[in-house]
Amino acid sequence: AFWGVAVALFASNDSFGRIIVGISQNLVAREAHPMAAEKSSSRSWMSDAAIYQIYPRSFKDSTGSGLGDIAGITQQMDYLEQLGIEAIWLSPFYPSPLVDGGYDVADYCDVDPRLGSLDDFDDMIAAAHVRGIKVIVDIVPNHSSNQHPWFKAALAAGPGSPERARYIFRDGRGEHGELPPTNWNANFGGPAWTRVADGQWYLHMFTPEQPDFDWSCPEVHAFFCDVLAFWSDRGVDGFRIDVAHGLAKDLDRDDLDRWHLAEGDDMVDDGTHPLWDRNEVHEIYREWRRVFDRYDPPRSAVAEAWVLPERQYLYARPNELGQTFNFE
């Protein structure tokens, strides 16, 4: 018995962005998964909204610079209203070296100065809300840019420091540590580990410029709760969580070399994969839900979670993110 299901559909495309209708799978398989029987007091508006995705750098240039910007989105708000959409979803607009289209974030609480300012962002939020349009932003919690101040501090501080504990650093193998800690390849190709000047290696499951956070570090938890509150305080209505099935990792085990992680063919259904879809990740999202619920109305969220279908419902529980993309 399935209930409350809406699959991800690309309803239309145009030169500015794309409209996504019903982006969520709002709890599945009630009989197979008893925990899915939990019900929130009200269904999230995100569950069946028409949502228009915007890549800010190519949407609308308000200055003639040749680059789209936040003010350009505000200028197009009447157009967006005429489409009949209910929300806009902004791809990353944060300061970034743009190694991965903005998903390498150098500052989680600011606007890339090439795109405008926080004042421009506030104006855009106000223009959207006066038209009844909600605003969703991307959050990238699995990794940062290597230009983030935290990672620069980690490199400067050295092995065993609190600064380095925010990321996944390990000693190498071999007589002189010259071999990476595991044999993994990254999702975008090449080794998943890069060696730094003092001989340690750091993990990056995407590009070398995107070091993975260590979510066993309490400081990382506190930081992202603050990030969510920062944007919620500015009026953001919802969050799309990038690589939501990542974050929690277990590198203290003896079988790491057997996992062919880049091929994506080693997903398991019991939450014990060393890197992806671990059971511990749900503790993070329950923590985030407490942040969302401090607001009236509560902030909404949706997980980008590439997981086995039978585990999608875990991310969509009302005491966690509430929705998840359905990639099947």
Identify the role of each PLM range.
Residues 305-328:
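Noncatalytic carbohydrate-binding groove/subsite architecture in carbohydrate-active enzymes
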Residues 19-34:
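Short, Lys/Arg-enriched N-terminal segments with co-localized hydrophobic residues
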Residues 36-229, 233, 246-309:
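Acidic/aromatic-lined carbohydrate-recognition and catalytic surfaces
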Residues 9-16:
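N-terminal polybasic/positive-inside topogenic patches
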Residues 88, 239-241:
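Hydrophobic residues within beta-strands of alpha/beta enzymes
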Residues 234-238:
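A glycine-centered loop/beta-turn motif at secondary-structure junctions
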